[in-house]
Design a protein with these regions (language model features):
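Active-site substrate-recognition segment that forms the wall
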Residues: 19-23, 81-83, 193-317
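Flavin (FAD/FMN) cofactor-binding and adjacent substrate-gating region
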Residues: 93-161, 166-167, 172-173, 303
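C-terminal catalytic lobe of FAD-dependent flavoproteins
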Residues: 283-374
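Glycine-rich FAD pyrophosphate-binding loop
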Residues: 23-43
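Dinucleotide-binding Rossmann-like beta1-alpha1 core, especially the glycine-rich loop
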Residues: 47-124, 237
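Predominantly flavin-linked oxidoreductase catalytic cores and closely associated redox partners
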Residues: 145-223
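N-terminal Rossmann-like FAD-binding beta1-loop-alpha1 element of flavoenzymes
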Residues: 3-30
């Protein structure tokens, strides 16, 4: 029987999984030593993009499409604005690249999209430079999630459904879990602990944690998240979204950053990364050429060598499951990923082999190299 579930970690993976176990009428205890919105967590931050394009990978495309529907349901349950579904675009620099393969996949899955000429894409933004674009892939049902509000909404839903919560440090000792020297009873444990995975389970040495910078630029009217699509540029390595809560347009430089030890290092932004952001935003959106920076934030990515997640039982103690290495893509799959993990555990099923605890081929480009389309 799997009636008594422990979920360690209150980030997006942990809360989504706990929520789905609770919906399945299981007893759930959440454990986390940090506050829900602590900035050390990989799930911290104000916003995340949600999109369905994943090149040829139907699993990820289908999962994110289901997650978007789940987020809309959670909005209705909580009566809170969580999902700005104003679309998301891909600025394609070639005709037969990542974006084209994504288009074929989402078409196959009946996920709505538009293949726009660069000129037509100019209607989506108050200012847009298009001379270096071949086309623009527009996903009208993608957009921006208010990440902090999403975490709080899920956490409060879990409590409303009867979840127990322990604000404490969980210790893995062989097949058991202790908090404050007290053994906790459970049938199944899910460890969703982000960058701490490699510290609690040292045999999982493939995980790398890197520092990544996001820059918020002072924005004129018309650049709010509810008015413009979020955006991605794979060739140049950028992603961003409109202004949320007056913070300014967000731009992230999505090239693998410096490695980072969550237990030792301080988080400091890279001047090079910030300069790349400043140059790009003025290029792509000319109205921002002289824009002031409102804020710079440094977060961490937790990644495997091939950028696929870890979703697997412990090799020696199979009642412990380890999930994580979200590579900053947890929110776009969150509730649907939680359902996937819950179904695996309750139905005694094996996860997709790409999520296994195995050696993986290094892909230096991270998620942009993840989906092979040769």
């Amino acid at each position: 029987m799997k009636e008594n579930i422990i979920v360690v970690g209150c980030g997006i993976f942990g809360l989504s999984t706990a929520f789905k176990f609770l919906q399945a009428k299981k007893k759930v205890t959440l454990i986390d030593p940090l506050p829900i919105l602590d900035s050390l967590k990989s799930s911290s931050g104000e916003s995340r993009n949600i999109r369905f394009s994943h090149a040829n990978d139907q699993f990820y495309s289908r999962l994110s499409w289901e997650a978007a529907k789940e987020w809309k349901k959670i909005e209705k349950i909580t009566n809170k604005k969580l999902f700005y579904d104003t679309g998301i675009v891909w600025f394609a620099a070639e005709d037969n690249g990542w974006e084209s393969h994504s288009e074929k996949t989402i078409k196959m899955l009946n996920i709505p999209y538009q293949h726009l000429s660069p000129k037509d894409a100019m209607k989506l933004y108050p200012s847009l430079h298009i001379d270096d674009l071949h086309f623009v892939l527009h996903e009208p049902h993608g957009g921006t999630l208010a990440a902090k509000k999403c975490l709080l909404a899920l956490f409060n839903l879990c409590l409303d459904l009867g979840c127990d919560y322990i604000n404490g440090q969980a210790e893995f000792i062989k097949n058991d879990i202790y908090v404050n020297d007290k053994r906790i009873d459970f049938d199944t444990a899910v460890w969703a602990i982000g960058p701490w995975i490699k510290h609690v389970f040292p045999f999982i040495d493939m995980i790398k944690v890197t520092m990544q910078d996001v820059v918020f630029f002072e924005s004129p009217d018309g650049w709010e998240a509810e008015k413009i699509p979020a955006f991605n540029d794979i060739k140049n390595g950028f992603y961003g979204c409109g202004s949320l809560d007056g913070m300014g347009v967000k731009l992230g430089y999505d090239v693998k950053g410096q490695e980072f030890d969550i237990t030792q290092n301080e988080r400091t932004h890279s001047e090079s990364s910030v300069n790349h952001c400043r140059k790009y935003i003025g290029h792509r959106f000319p109205v921002f050429k002289k824009a002031k920076i409102n804020l710079i934030k440094t977060c961490q990515y937790t990644m495997t060598p091939d950028a696929n997640w870890i979703i697997a039982p412990h090799p020696e103690y199979p009642r412990h499951w380890i999930i994580g290495a979200g590579s900053a893509h947890g929110f776009k799959h969150g509730p649907a990923l939680g359902q996937y993990v819950t179904d695996l555990i309750l139905n005694n099923e094996d996860p997709d082999p790409k999520f296994a605890l195995m050696e993986r081929q290094e892909r230096p480009g991270g998620w942009r190299d993840l989906y092979q389309y040769e």
